Swiss-Prot record:
It comes from the Eukaryota. Its main location: membrane. Residues 294-511 are annotated as: BARA. Keywords: Endosome, Membrane, Vacuole. Pfam families: APG6 (PF04111), APG6_N (PF17675). This is Vacuolar protein sorting-associated protein 30. Component of the autophagy-specific VPS34 PI3-kinase complex I composed of VPS15, VPS30, VPS34, ATG14 and ATG38; and of the VPS34 PI3-kinase complex II composed of VPS15, VPS30, VPS34 and VPS38. The keyword Membrane applies. Disruption phenotype: leads to seven- to eightfold decrease of the renal fungal load of infected mice. Does not affect protein trafficking. Coiled coil: none annotated.
Length: 512
C-alpha cells in the first residue's frame, strides 16, 4: 500500500469517543461473502424462525463452489462491484468467514482478517484518495444501518467495551429464551393433563366442592371480621376517650406543678433575700460594734516603744551615740506629742493656765505667758540647725524652755483629771444610793467603767512624777548639746505619761 492510501485511513474518527483513528488496511480488501454479512437481512431478526437459521446457513454453505469455479465467481463479483478488488482467495477462507459471520463471533472474525491480510495483494492501487474515502464511508454507513445499532467506525477500546456490553445482552437473551422454553413445556404438560376427561370432571367436581367450602368459609370469616371490626371500633373509641382523659389529667398536673414551682421559686427567692438581708444586717452590726470598740484617739496616736526609744505614730523620740536618729524624725515625734496634748485638753474642755500649744508638725511651738512682762513668749519644740550663742556657752535654749513648758502642761492636765475624778466620784456615790435596781441594770456597766477610770488617778495618778524640768528625776533640758541616752530615757517617761492621759481621755469620751 502506498503512502496515499495509508494517509486516507487517518481521516476517520471514532463515533463513540470522537478520537481520530487509523482504519485497518483489511477494510479495503473485503470478500463478497464478507460484504454480504454486512447487509441487513430480515430473516435474521429475533423470532420463532431463528432456530432454523443454522440449518439454512449450512445448506447455503454446501452450495458454495470450490476450486477454480469459486475463484472465478469471486473475481467476477469484485470486478462488477464498486468496492475494492481482491486477488484469488482460498475457498476455505471464504467458507470460514461465512460461518463465523453467521454465528456472530467477532473475535474469530478478527483473527481471520489478520490471516487474510497476509495472503491478499491489492491489484489496483491507482484509485484516488476520494474514491477510497467514499468507499470506506459507504462501508461504514452500511455497517451503521445494519441491525447492530452501532455507529461505525469505532476504535479498538470502544469496540472492546461494546463487545462486553453485547455479551451481557446476549447472556440476558439466553436466560430469557430458556425461561420461555420452560414456560412452553409447562403449558404443554398442562394441556396433556387436561386431555383426560375423567380426571377433568373429577377435578371440576372437587373444584366445585372446594369453591363452596371456600365461599362458606369466606362468609363465616366475613361475619367474624365484621364482629371484630365492631369490637375494634368500640375499643378505638374507648382508647380515644381514655387518651383524652389522660391528656387532660396531664395538662392539669402540668398547670398545678407549674403553679407550685412558681410558688416554690418565689419562696426560695424570698428566703434568699431574707438570708442575704440578715447576713448584711449581722455584718453591719459587727462593723458597728467594731467601730464602737475602736478608740479614735488610740488609733490616731499609737504610743509604743522600740528598745530604748519611745515611739508615737511610729516616730522615734530620742537619740544617743550608738543609735542616731535624725532631727527630722525627732521633731515630727514632738509635733505629734503637742497635737495629742492639745486634742486631750480640747476634748475634755480643760483650760491650761499660762500656756498655748501650737501644733505645726515638725515645727510645733508652745507659748508661755510671762507675768513680769505681761506678754506671751514662744518657744520652739524642735531642733534647729541655726547658730546660737546658747549652744556655744551651754546655756538654756528656747528648746529647753519649751520642753520644760511641755512637762508643766502634762502636769496641769493630770491635775485637772484628778479634780474631775474627785467630783465625779462624789456624784456617783450619791447616785448609787438613790438609784433603783432597774437603773442599776441599765447604767451599772457605765458606772463601773467610770469608777475604774477614776481609780486610775486617785490611786497612782501619773506613772512618772513631774517636778519642774525633771520627770522621774531626769532633766529634759539639753543646754544646746546633742541628744543623749539620759534625755532619750526622759522622753520615754514623758510619752508613757502621755499615754496614761490618752487612756483616761478615751474612757471619759466613751462614757459620754
Amino acid at each position: 500500500m502506498n503512502d496515499l492510501q495509508f494517509d486516507s485511513l487517518k481521516v476517520f474518527k471514532c463515533q463513540n469517543c470522537h478520537l481520530p483513528l487509523q482504519v485497518d488496511p483489511t477494510m479495503l480488501h473485503l470478500s463478497k461473502s464478507q460484504r454480504e454479512l454486512l447487509l441487513p437481512r430480515e430473516d435474521r431478526r429475533p423470532g420463532v424462525e431463528e432456530f432454523n437459521l443454522r440449518q439454512e446457513s449450512q445448506d447455503m454453505l454446501k452450495k458454495v463452489k470450490t476450486g477454480k469455479e469459486a475463484k472465478q465467481l469471486l473475481k467476477e463479483d469484485f470486478q462488477s462491484s464498486d468496492f475494492l478488488f481482491l486477488r484469488d482467495i482460498d475457498d476455505s477462507i471464504a467458507e470460514k468467514d461465512l460461518k463465523k459471520g453467521l454465528e456472530g463471533d467477532n473475535d474469530d472474525r478478527k483473527s481471520n482478517e489478520d490471516s487474510m491480510v497476509s495472503e491478499l495483494d491489492v491489484e489496483d492501487t491507482a484509485k484516488t484518495l476520494s474514491t477510497q474515502i467514499e468507499r470506506l464511508s459507504k462501508l461504514f454507513e452500511i455497517m451503521s444501518t445494519s441491525e447492530s445499532n452501532i455507529d461505525y467506525p469505532i476504535c479498538q477500546e470502544c469496540c472492546n467495551i461494546m463487545m462486553k456490553r453485547l455479551k451481557t445482552d446476549y447472556e440476558k437473551a439466553v436466560k430469557e429464551r430458556d425461561l420461555y422454553f420452560q414456560f412452553v413445556k409447562r403449558i404443554e404438560k398442562q394441556q396433556l393433563d387436561e386431555s383426560d376427561s375423567s380426571q377433568l370432571s373429577l377435578r371440576q367436581k372437587e373444584y366445585t366442592d372446594q369453591t363452596k367450602k371456600i365461599n362458606q368459609e369466606r362468609e363465616r370469616l366475613l361475619l367474624e371480621l365484621t364482629k371484630k371490626e365492631q369490637v375494634e371500633e368500640e375499643l378505638d373509641a374507648e382508647i380515644a376517650e381514655l387518651t383524652r382523659q389522660i391528656s387532660e389529667k396531664k395538662a392539669n398536673e402540668r398547670a398545678t406543678r407549674k403553679i407550685d414551682n412558681a410558688k416554690q421559686w418565689d419562696k426560695m427567692k424570698l428566703l434568699n433575700d431574707i438570708s442575704s438581708l440578715q447576713y448584711q444586717y449581722e455584718t453591719e452590726l459587727n462593723k458597728l460594734d467594731q467601730l464602737r470598740k475602736t478608740n479614735i484617739y488610740n488609733e490616731s496616736f499609737r504610743i509604743s516603744h522600740q528598745g530604748p526609744f519611745a515611739t508615737i505614730c511610729g516616730l522615734k523620740l530620742g537619740s544617743y551615740e550608738d543609735h542616731k536618729v535624725s532631727y527630722s524624725e525627732i521633731n515630727a515625734a514632738l509635733g505629734q506629742l503637742v497635737l495629742l496634748l492639745m486634742t486631750i485638753s480640747s476634748s475634755l474642755n480643760i483650760k491650761i493656765s499660762g500656756y498655748r500649744l501650737q501644733p505645726i508638725g515638725s515645727t510645733s511651738k508652745v507659748s508661755k505667758f510671762l507675768a513680769d512682762k505681761e506678754d506671751w513668749e514662744t518657744y520652739e519644740l524642735y531642733f534647729s540647725s541655726n547658730f546660737s550663742l546658747e549652744k556655744i556657752f551651754k546655756r538654756e535654749t528656747d528648746f529647753d524652755k519649751g520642753m520644760e513648758s511641755l512637762l508643766d502642761i502634762v502636769k496641769q492636765i493630770s491635775l485637772s483629771f484628778s479634780t474631775v475624778v474627785s467630783s465625779d466620784t462624789d456624784i456617783n456615790i450619791q447616785d448609787e444610793r438613790t438609784r433603783s435596781n432597774d437603773s442599776m441594770l441599765n447604767g451599772g456597766a457605765n458606772r463601773n467603767a467610770n469608777l475604774r477610770a477614776d481609780r486610775l488617778f486617785t490611786e497612782s495618778e501619773l506613772p512618772y512624777m513631774i517636778d519642774g524640768d525633771r520627770i522621774n528625776g531626769i532633766s529634759v533640758k539639753l543646754y544646746g548639746a546633742e541628744p543623749n541616752l539620759e534625755w532619750t530615757t526622759a522622753m520615754k517617761f514623758l510619752l508613757t505619761d502621755a499615754k496614761w492621759l490618752l487612756v483616761f481621755c478615751s474612757s471619759k469620751l466613751s462614757l459620754q
